[in-house]
Amino acid sequence: MSFDNSARCGAMNAADEIIGPPLAQGLADQPAIVGGARSVTYGELEAMVNRTGNAMKAHGVGRGERVLFLMDDSPEMVAGYLGAMRIGAVAVALNVRLAPRDVRYVIEDSACRLLFVDAEFAHLYQEIAGELADPPQVVVRGAPQRIGMALDDFVAGQPDTLASEPAAPEDIAFWVYSSGTTGRPKAVMHSHGCVLIADRMEAEYFGVRPGDRIFATSKMFFGWALGHSMMGGLRCGATVIVAAGWPDPVRMIEVVDTHRPTLFFSTPVMYRNLLREGVGASEGFRNVRHFLSAGEKLPETLYQSWLEATGKPLIDGIGASETIFLFLVNDAGAQRPGSCGKPVPWAEVRLVDEAGADVVEPDIPGQIAIRTPSQFRGYWNLPEQTAKSLRDGWYFPGDMFSFDRDGYWYHNGRADDMLKISGQWVSPSEIEGCAMTAPGIAEAVVVGVPQEDGLTRLVLVAVPKDPSASQSRLSTQVQDTLMANLSIYKCPRTVRFVDELPRTATGKIQKFRLRELLKAGRL
């Protein structure tokens, strides 16, 4: 098997392209994954991948069948993910903060054959297991549960060698679930061939090589960590750092001080929170060579605050679940604060106006279109959305951009009403519909309001059925309803009440007026 970047034709396998290069370089004894007190070498990871892949085959998982992972980042999760791709199955990592109803939806939507779940998240499956017409086989990592079989038993006695299932570059290797315009998760399908560029940004922009350590604060269900930390880091022969538990700034500082990454991937909201925790005093952060930011717009004020606190800049870029890897990024030596950088050499990027013509002059907004080797193959079971987003070989994400005379690109917002909160797409209409099921709520509108630090928070503006009702009680009721039915990142922490919503002459709600009132502190 060739692990050369030119291996674009003929049989291949994504798992081989990710873990094969470091093994071919003789790095079997070097650490591939570290976390907590554990360290797993490339040779040990290869054996884990093969045992898990063999176990999947023994339990009837076949080519093209979906294998879901409701797991925290860990060597076992990575081994299972690569093992699924190695046998020709489709690996799918899930957000561990999904609501049970969303877990049910994903299981049914994917028609998955096998579900790996950590014991601490088993309740998310148990709550909906009885509602499934065709439940998957379940494998549990951690404390014994009343469902499925233990991971140790699942892989026990399996060989640590495994011949990879040959795949064409365009065959599907993995999915990434991303929220759709209705709020329902949608499966973004990626091919085996897309991983062939997994290492290019790390190697060509930031000089990553064996001996480097990469840490992404985001979890691997998120394309930022999956593509650039796990896939890119391993393909470069670097060490990938994983951290148990949901990321919080205090814990992230502890991880950095313990494991000393040389490359650090995170989001603007985490960088802001790290500053609040006094990251400048951390010895581990002084060891980091490059700090990269993606997932949402990086405010210039946050860029400057980070530079003052650490002495090193935040390198901003932008990608998407549909591209897995960044398509715009600032160069470490030539940054433009406030911009997303310039197109990477392996991606084509252009702007189009409302008539579909190319925008060729600077400082004129248009809708961005991207063409890259890592482009997704479509949305599972959503042909209309696929046709809307993939046109003549170009991916249209629905984002508005402009570029300046020096070729730096700037994000101008969404063409539709979707909002990005903590790096994840949120559908206001889904939240609004849920809020209006709460007792006493007649109407509800969700808007994104910029904070002083430039990030966005969700605010729910509601009209009570009874204007004399206690707003405190109504606020509690609506927030309880949201928390019971939606994933936590979709739940606004702020609720405001009005007698009526501002509307146009044709009856359309004017969200911009609500946003202006909230920004001015008049609501």
Curated annotation (Swiss-Prot):
Top-tier EC class: ligase
Its GO biological process terms? Answer: secondary metabolite biosynthetic process
Q: What induces it?
A: Transcriptionally regulated by HbdR.
Signal sequence bounds = none
User: Keyword Endoplasmic reticulum, does the record have it?
Assistant: no
Write the record's keywords in alphabetical order, separated by commas.
Answer: ATP-binding, Ligase, Nucleotide-binding
The record's listing under InterPro entries reads: AMP-bd_C, AMP-bd_C_sf, AMP-dep_synth/lig_dom, ANL_N_sf, Benz_CoA_lig
The text of the family note is:
Belongs to the ATP-dependent AMP-binding enzyme family. Benzoate-CoA ligase subfamily.
What function does the entry list?
Answer: Ligase involved in the anaerobic degradation of 3-hydroxybenzoate (3OHBz). Catalyzes the activation of 3-hydroxybenzoate to 3-hydroxybenzoyl-CoA. Also shows high activity with protocatechuate and 4-hydroxybenzoate. Exhibits lower activity with benzoate, but cannot use 2-hydroxybenzoate or benzoate analogs containing other substituents at the ortho position, such as 2-aminobenzoate (anthranilate).
- Indicate what this protein is called per its UniProt record: 3-hydroxybenzoate--CoA ligase
Species name: Aromatoleum sp. (strain CIB) (Azoarcus sp. (strain CIB))
